[in-house]
Amino acid sequence: MYRAVTWYVLEHNVDPTDSDHIIELLESARIICDLQNNQSRILIDDVDPADHLRDDRVNDEVSLVSRVPRVREILVEKMRSYAREHDLVMEGRDIGSVVLPDTPYKFYIDASPEVRSQRRALQGERDAIAVRDHADSSRRASPLVVAKDAEVIDTSNMSIAAVVDEIIRRLKLKGFPI
């Protein structure tokens, strides 16, 4: 969601450091989360920004936009509302610590900054992982932290399939019906 909102802010030529203008823009925007073909999507004023969520310009500015406290309030409420309406898996940097702190199944998926940068490069993306990690962990509003009851999975040496298998294994151990 934060990437979608960042894209929207940039599309409207709003300076990502102008908190007041960002808030004004978002408070008048219609942000919808829905499911289509069993896939979640975000629409902002009826536009689906999915193809732009990993654009370099979004990568460069997402931490600036997402650290605005009112932006976080708006989006956290949207995510909580969506979770109340649907059974779902939600991923994000503060899902287990801020958005859904009471969920019984929390995983903190991580990898070394070097591996994450390599993965992004293979996907054709440029992202300053270490810079973004520092910005996200030091922001005042919802800083990046590992929830105290989250299970940490270091994926540095794992394939996507192995990560999925590990999550399923841990869910089964917790009694989740799979």
Segments predicted by a language model, with ranges:
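ATP-dependent small-molecule kinase phosphotransfer cores
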Residues: 2-86, 99, 114, 126-131, ...
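Small-molecule kinase domains that catalyze NTP-dependent phosphoryl transfer to phosphate-bearing small molecules
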Residues: 34, 79-86, 93-103, 122-167
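Structural signal for conserved beta-strand scaffold positions within catalytic alpha/beta enzyme cores
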Residues: 48, 108, 152-154
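A short beta-strand-to-loop transition that corresponds to the Sensor-1 phosphate-sensing loop
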Residues: 92-93, 111
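Conserved AAA+ ATPase core "coupling" helix
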Residues: 111-122
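C-terminal alpha-helix
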Residues: 166-174
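ATP-dependent carboxylate-amine ligase
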Residues: 176-178
